Amino acid sequence: MDDPPGPPRQERPSPVLDPGDNVAAQKHAIYSEEGAAVLRAGFPPDWLQPPGKILQAELDARDITQAELAARTNLSAKHVNQVVKGTASLTIDMALRLERTLGTPASFWNRLEANHQDQRARERVRSEWARDHLGWLRRFPIQALIDRGVLSADDSDVTMLERLLAFFQVADLDAYERTWAEPVAAGFRRAQHANADPYATAAWLRLGERSAWNTKSQPYDAVAFARMLPALRRLTLLSDREAFAALRRECAEVGVAVEFERELPGCRACGAAKMITPTKGLILLSGRYRFHDIFWFAFFHEAAHLILHPRRRVIVDLDLSGDDADGQESATNAYAASALIPDEYADQLTERTTARRATEIAHAIGVAPGIVAGRLSYLQNNWTRYSRLRRKLHDITP
């Protein structure tokens, strides 16, 4: 007869990382598979106690005094006490002596000491950051970054520094300057530098880039993107949310991630464009000014940048007026304008164009009337005449 089935097998629990546990728990944490995984990934600062504290717990469990341990290990009582207090390191030699006298592997003590020294080194670096870099941290719109989930209101200044560097994926401030500050500054047009907050703009751009990494797309095809661009103007007829979803979907098919991120305080960007990898472009829009026609012109403007200026590391537009000295913006505006309103229709837009005629032209092109009204308002520098045709931008993200 078969033996009756035993009790159901229980899953092995994860190590309990309670600083109050005795050394057995620490051994399990270090030598178990779970503990090894934690060690590979790194652990919170208080995950393991200093070696001296664990040693004292071991002595207490065995009812051994420090003096007895000193005698058994042939070390001075003073040195044992210093190790217990954490004022002296637990050396490799002492670890071997503890292995012989207590039976605990020397590798256990060595790993404890290595982890402890690593933690102390991290704390020293954290303190140096806090002392030297608080001024850099405070240049950013902290509350807005808390609201966006980049930082936490519960973070200390040191933790905020670490989180912000990790957010930008850089190791230190010099790396931030090379990777973010210099490209962003170069991305502004000459006339915009006085109005630009480079720190808020860099954070806004990074938010968009982070979203773009999560957007699945085909490899970038500049020719296909340029070919499809005029057809995208039909999306202006849809609701904002439907249009943006379709825009993202169609652009992803040719390797362009289109992202939306409200501007941060101090960031006055309408849009930005960059190649985040050789096979993936990014168009980032902020919805600044909150008008439907401005949003769509901003998209076509940034799309034109990707097509016309693919070698520039990043391009940030605070406005879309074409005020630069080298003519790049004028060329970009002209390209975007033709894609949105073909030249044969643009030639019909004059000061004598009525709101009714503007609507007829929009229908002929296949765009929302506000797109034509926005162009007329810009050309005439009169933002009231066609205001009833222009509408506000609604929420475009779920």
Q: Which residues are covered by each model-predicted region?
A:
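Active-site hotspot residues in diverse enzymes, especially metal/ion-binding acidic/histidine motifs
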Residues: 2-9, 15-398
